[in-house]
């Protein structure tokens, strides 16, 4: 590994100007240059978690900075020191943006040459495969049905309708079916889309007089995987076109897999004929996992990250987060990040305070909240406490008020004072807005959690 490299040094300088100091010091500075060949920049990170975090949150930012320095396209790969030192055969953590770019180019090629069946039209998450799905009593039937459909599509269970609450594994099973089919038959045309994408494609095709393109995209596939079908609610024209698409595929013997947060009969304003179609195959529901399954999920996640979690910590996390798998895995990720950055051991005693789902996890000062929020959103502290109604500022201010309410003992009027003398009703409204968005907007939920993590790390360092 090379100690220094002029290109990476320049990229770091550019990133330091564009990122907040905590973000740069925590994530970018520890990354070490490895090599730069044929437009591929390889960086070494302290551990697998840091590689994964950089890939998810900073790969595109690093690539853009590198492209600005080099003057041509750059892709970034992250390797952990453990994998490098152990000559591990684990695949490199490749930029998600690179994967997305490849998917976009494949989809474009598919649209331009629909007769070339070796060019796939799917857009599947590489992690959502059967071997990574932990089967429990809550999901055994859905898993068995998904595997049966993957092995023999268009036969017994057509359509396969998978239903269950948020974050229980519906999307994972759907995409696992797609991966399985592509692995068995590389020429299979597999398409995974959300209902919102289906509706958006339909609207665009109408505007551009391109219904033939739309029909070709959706009716020429061998396997259609459509997520969040509950969003068909009240969309009459979209329901009409989906009904026609469904019939065309079904009559051609093609497999249809549908996912929803509820059974067909419970989706409001859904046409009876669609309810009938959705119910004619198999409806398989997924329930929240029991504690044994949750512990197995955490242990599998730890194995994938090559970590050895104490059993009492696994049991603690599994007992604390019971509503869905996404929340459970998020808790694991936060715990690993916290231990990695602070250097504290992975024990219940050190991890428990920052895993409280209803609080910041530590007591913080108003100044800490304002600094972390302003740094995170790249606004000044003065703007944050001002009366500015610019959207970026007002959104940051609402999140700041929410975090201050959770992390301090201040009353609503006192929080208002910290934000430039705002009325307590303004603070109450801001908190309510953030609470609503936490359950409906993944981006806001991610932003809030990242700032919580930064506050926890900052407070621990000052202990």
From Swiss-Prot:
According to the record, the signal peptide region is: none
Q: What is this protein called?
A: Chromosomal replication initiator protein DnaA
Q: How does it assemble?
A: Oligomerizes as a right-handed, spiral filament on DNA at oriC.
Keyword Nucleotide-binding set for record: yes
Domain note for this entry? Domain I is involved in oligomerization and binding regulators, domain II is flexibile and of varying length in different bacteria, domain III forms the AAA+ region, while domain IV binds dsDNA.
Chief site of localization:
cytoplasm
Q: Which family does it belong to?
A: Belongs to the DnaA family.
Q: Where does ATP bind?
A: 167, 169-171
- What is the documented function of this protein? Plays an essential role in the initiation and regulation of chromosomal replication. ATP-DnaA binds to the origin of replication (oriC) to initiate formation of the DNA replication initiation complex once per cell cycle. Binds the DnaA box (a 9 base pair repeat at the origin) and separates the double-stranded (ds)DNA. Forms a right-handed helical filament on oriC DNA; dsDNA binds to the exterior of the filament while single-stranded (ss)DNA is stabiized in the filament's interior.
Q: Which keywords does this Swiss-Prot/TrEMBL entry list?
A: ATP-binding, Cytoplasm, DNA replication, DNA-binding, Lipid-binding, Nucleotide-binding
Q: Where is this region: Domain II?
A: 79-122
- Region annotation Domain IV, binds dsDNA: where it falls in the sequence: 340-463
Identify the stretch(es) annotated as Domain I, interacts with DnaA modulators: 1-79
- Species this chain originates from: Prochlorococcus marinus (strain MIT 9515)
Gene that produces this protein: dnaA
Covalent S-S links between cysteines: none
For biological process, the GO terms are: DNA replication initiation; regulation of DNA replication
An example GO CC term for this entry is: cytoplasm
Q: Name one GO molecular function term.
A: ATP binding
């Amino acid at each position: 590994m090379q100690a220094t490299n002029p290109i990476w040094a320049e990229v770091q300088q550019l990133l330091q100007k564009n990122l907040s100091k905590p973000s740069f010091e925590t994530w970018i500075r520890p990354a070490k240059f490895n090599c730069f060949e044929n437009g591929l920049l390889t960086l070494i990170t302290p551990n697998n978690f840091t590689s994964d975090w950089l890939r998810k949150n900073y790969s595109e930012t690093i690539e853009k900075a590198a492209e600005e320095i080099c003057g041509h396209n750059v892709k970034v790969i992250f390797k952990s020191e453990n994998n490098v030192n152990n000559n591990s055969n684990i695949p490199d953590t490749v930029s998600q943006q690179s994967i997305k770019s490849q998917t976009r180019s494949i989809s474009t090629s598919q649209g331009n040459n629909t007769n070339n069946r070796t060019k796939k039209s799917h857009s599947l998450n590489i992690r959502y495969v059967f071997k990574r799905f932990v089967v429990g009593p809550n999901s055994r039937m859905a898993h068995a049905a998904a595997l049966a459909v993957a092995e023999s599509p268009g036969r017994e269970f057509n359509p396969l309708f998978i239903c269950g609450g948020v974050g229980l594994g519906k999307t994972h099973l759907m995409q696992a079916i797609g991966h399985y089919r592509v692995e068995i038959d590389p020429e299979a045309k597999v398409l995974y889309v959300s209902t919102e994408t289906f509706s958006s494609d339909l609207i665009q095709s109408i505007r551009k007089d391109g219904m033939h393109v739309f029909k070709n995209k959706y009716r020429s596939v061998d396997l259609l995987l459509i997520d969040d079908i509950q969003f068909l609610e009240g969309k009459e024209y979209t329901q009409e076109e989906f009904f026609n698409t469904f019939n065309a595929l079904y009559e051609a013997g093609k497999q249809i897999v549908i996912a929803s947060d509820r059974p067909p009969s419970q989706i409001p304003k859904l046409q009876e004929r669609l309810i009938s179609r959705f119910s004619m195959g198999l409806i398989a529901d997924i329930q929240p996992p029991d504690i044994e399954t949750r512990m197995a999920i955490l242990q599998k996640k730890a194995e994938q990250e090559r970590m050895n979690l104490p059993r009492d910590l696994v049991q603690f996390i599994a007992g604390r987060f019971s509503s869905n798998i996404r929340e459970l895995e998020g808790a694991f990720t936060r715990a690993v990040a916290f231990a990695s950055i602070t250097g504290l051991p992975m024990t219940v005693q050190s991890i428990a305070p920052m895993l409280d789902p209803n609080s910041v996890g530590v007591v913080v000062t108003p100044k800490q909240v304002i600094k972390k929020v302003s740094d995170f959103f790249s606004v000044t502290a003065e703007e944050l406490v001002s009366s500015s109604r610019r959207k970026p500022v007002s959104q940051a201010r609402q999140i700041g008020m929410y975090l201050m309410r959770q992390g301090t003992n201040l009353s609503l009027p006192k929080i208002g004072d910290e934000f430039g003398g705002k009325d307590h009703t303004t603070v109450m409204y801001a908190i309510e807005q953030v609470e609503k968005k936490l359950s409906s907007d993944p981006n806001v939920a991610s932003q809030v959690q990242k700032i919580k993590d930064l506050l926890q790390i900052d407070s621990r360092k000052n202990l």
